A protein has these predicted regions:
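ABC family nucleotide-binding domain
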Residues: 4-211
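H-loop (His-switch) and adjacent beta-strand-loop-beta switch element
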Residues: 211-223
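ABC-family P-loop ATPase nucleotide-binding domain
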Residues: 1-13, 220-227
Length: 227
């Protein structure tokens, strides 16, 4: 597999009245195309800060971040926004679906913003996540697990290179969480999307190809997940 991204000695420090907080302290990661990386750690470990740096929502204090052979822009909001728009998809703990749009319209809107008005892809994505029959319903009319599956379809509608998930099953029960994660795995494999998924839930490791454990802003371990 070709290398998608590489981070070297990434640091993210914050100044507070109590002193400097080291949210990330010397992070070294490289991720290849097609990997599904589970980024595991307790609350306050630095995993969400790392996710924000991966997406260029935040800029590291120091270190190097190369994506597809080019240094990722930092500190210039226009360049960072352009990088996110071209490369990154997101799935969050809260579904953030537009409640006054139908399920299909939620996905079609993202496609249109990306310059693709072909509604057939939106319908194909709903088929992929098992929700074609719900396409004309509104988000409030379907279950939380179904809403998260719509969020997954929406996040890959523009064909992102890298999909980032932040505690995406945090509001779901165990059975629903398993169904959502299986949908995510199948979608990433079919669309050839690389994923980094932040969680504190050990049970989600089996849905990755690799697990990176982080605590106190440092990587504690980095291992392949056995099939």
């Amino acid at each position: 597999m070709d290398k998608l991204l590489e981070m070297k000695n990434i640091q993210r420090f914050y100044s507070t009245p109590a002193g400097v907080v080291k949210a990330l302290d010397g992070i070294n990661i490289d991720i290849s195309e097609g990997e599904r990386v589970i980024l595991l750690g307790p609350s306050g470990s630095g995993k969400t800060t790392l996710l924000n740096c991966l997406s260029a929502l935040d800029s590291p204090t120091g270190g190097s971040y190369v994506f597809q052979g080019s240094e990722v822009p930092r500190n210039r909001s226009e360049d960072m926004t352009s990088f996110r728009r071209e490369n990154i998809g997101y799935v969050f703990q809260f579904f953030n679906l537009l409640q006054d749009l139908t399920v299909l319209e939620n996905i079609s809107l993202i496609q249109e913003l990306a310059g693709n008005k072909d509604q057939s892809r939106a319908i194909d994505l709903l088929k992929m996540v098992g929700l074609e029959s719900e396409k004309d319903r509104f988000p409030g009319e379907i279950s939380g697990g179904q809403q998260q599956r719509v969020a997954i379809a929406r996040s890959i509608a523009k064909k992102p290179t890298l999909l980032l998930g932040d505690e995406l099953t945090g509001n779901l029960d165990t059975e629903t969480s398993s169904k959502v994660m299986q949908v995510l795995v199948e979608a990433c494999e079919k669309e050839n999307i690389t994923a980094v998924l932040v969680t504190h839930d050990e049970s989600l490791i089996r849905y990755g190809t690799r697990v990176i454990r982080i605590d106190s802003g440092k990587i504690q371990s980095d291992e392949q997940v056995l099939p």
